[in-house]
Structures are given as C-alpha cells and as structure tokens.
Amino acid sequence: MQFSKMHGLGNDFMVVDAVTQNVYFSPELIRRLADRHTGVGFDQMLVVEPPYDPELDFHYRIFNADGSEVSQCGNGARCFARFVRLKGLTNKRDISVSTQTGRMILSVTEDELVCVNMGEPNFEPQSVPFRAAKAEKTYILRAAEHTVLCGVVSMGNPHCVMQVDDVSVANVALLGPVLESHERFPERANIGFMQVVSREHIRLRVYERGAGETQACGSGACAAVAVGIQQELLGEEVHVELPGGSLHISWKGPGHPLYMTGPATHVYDGFIHL
C-alpha cells in the first residue's frame, strides 16, 4: 500500500489514497501502523475516498492513533487538500469534501497555504455532545480534585476550552486525560488550554481525544477562538500560537462560518506491506 507522511505544524499524519487503491483498516491495524517504534507513526491517519455525493470532490475520513474514527481534524484537512493535488487526484484549488458530520471547502492559496471553511461553531450541548440542561457561555467541571471553568463547542468534533494564565506551565498531562473522558462528554472531548495574550493573539495547547497532547490541533485552534469570541475575550481575527507553529483564525460571529488558514507539509512517500 502506498501512503504519504505529512504534517500540519507538527501534527503528523499517514495519508492514504483510497480512490486508486483498495484498502481496509481495522482498529488493530491502525494502532499497529501508528506505533512510532514498530510502525509508520502518526497522530492521525487520513483516508481519501471517492465522494459519497456526486456534487462533491472527495470523502474525508480520520482515524486516531488508538484506532477510533473521528469526524473532524483541521490540520488534517489542510494536509488532505495538499495531498489530493500533489497526487494528481484533482487540480482544483477549491476542493469540496464530506466528512462523517458535514461538508467543508478546502482552498489552496497561491503560496500553498490552505484555508479551510470549518463551518459555524455549534454551542448547543446536545450537538457537542455535552451533558447540560441548557447552553451557557461557561460551565464548571470537577476533575482530578480541580474545579475548571470552561467553554464547550463543536467544530464537527467535541471541544472543551479553558483559559489559563500561562500555557507553558498548564497541567495538560494531568487535566487533559481526565477531562477528555469526563462523564459529561459521552463521546469524550478534545481539551484546549488557552492563554489570551491580546484580543488578536492567543497561545494554545491541546490534549486531543484519542491521541494525547499534539504539536498542533487545527479544530482545537478554531474551538479556542470561537469560545474566546463568545466570551468576549477576542476579536474577529486571531493569531493562534501552538507548540508546532501558528494558525490564523477568522470568525465574524453567529450566523457566519469560521475560517482557518495555515500550512501543510509533505514529508515523504512510502510503501508498506500489510
């Protein structure tokens, strides 16, 4: 099977063309391939499939390193767009894809950055999903003997975002896994630790559902900005600084889609016998 290794700001992927190849991945096989000592090694596997809807260009599937399938990965979406162009599957600059939960437009710029229309952030608890009687701007969660004030949003996948004074010393290793599997998130969640530098600049670390802390999380950056704007902490255009690099997030507020712009890097092509 042919594949490519790619990354978006250090969030790394094994990308597989299932348009021209017949492939099947069990959770066990994905876990073996994800192993950084004995496999290919990656945070997520991205699979390019033929479109389920003839009006679209491709279907986009995402698998975490633990073998679970998820509905959204923003950094992966940028790599997906670069991959289908590099492999000659399309020459379009505006690429339409479906996911488990919706549709996206991926736009490749002249300087090969990728702008992703991530859709409108959804704060309704049942859509996240999150167990709450009604939608609030902030919720109180208790985890590992800590009381956490957070915002909750779906970007096509569930996110919990908390504000911290200094992201460099945030207790991601302790709070990340506890909040990821908190009982109020029936499908688990991605956990963002956000330091607000100014209304146009945040620093962010993300503990990803099924992958642990990564160098960057695109949907996590989108979620953090959406929550920050909802809580009136941020403006419409925000520079998001992650351990692996920076993204630009733009959102005009309710009724409008959120846009994420950033790089996608091709590392190498490979072949593996399954």
UniProtKB/Swiss-Prot annotation:
EC number from the UniProt entry: 5.1.1.7
SUPFAM superfamilies linked to this entry: Diaminopimelate epimerase-like (SSF54506)
Entry keyword ATP-binding: no
Subcellular location, record wording: Cytoplasm
Keyword Amino-acid biosynthesis (UniProt): yes
GO terms under biological process: lysine biosynthetic process via diaminopimelate
InterPro entries: DAP_epimerase_AS, DAP_epimerase_DapF
Keywords (A to Z) from UniProt: Amino-acid biosynthesis, Cytoplasm, Isomerase, Lysine biosynthesis
Residue(s) at site: Important for dimerization: 268
Pathway(s) per entry: Amino-acid biosynthesis; L-lysine biosynthesis via DAP pathway; DL-2,6-diaminopimelate from LL-2,6-diaminopimelate: step 1/1
Major localization class: cytoplasm
Active-site residues, as the UniProt record annotates them: 73 (proton donor), 217 (proton acceptor)
Sites annotated Could be important to modulate the pK values of the two catalytic cysteine residues: 159, 208
Record-level Gene Ontology MF annotations: diaminopimelate epimerase activity
Positions of substrate binding: 11, 44, 64, 74-75, 157, 190, 208-209, 218-219
Cellular component, GO annotation: cytosol
Catalytic activity, reaction form: (2S,6S)-2,6-diaminopimelate = meso-2,6-diaminopimelate
Stored NCBIfam families: DapF
Entry similarity comment: Belongs to the diaminopimelate epimerase family.
Protein's job: Catalyzes the stereoinversion of LL-2,6-diaminopimelate (L,L-DAP) to meso-diaminopimelate (meso-DAP), a precursor of L-lysine and an essential component of the bacterial peptidoglycan.
Complexes and interactors: Homodimer.
Protein name as annotated: Diaminopimelate epimerase
Species annotation: Yersinia enterocolitica serotype O:8 / biotype 1B (strain NCTC 13174 / 8081)
Gene that this sequence comes from: dapF
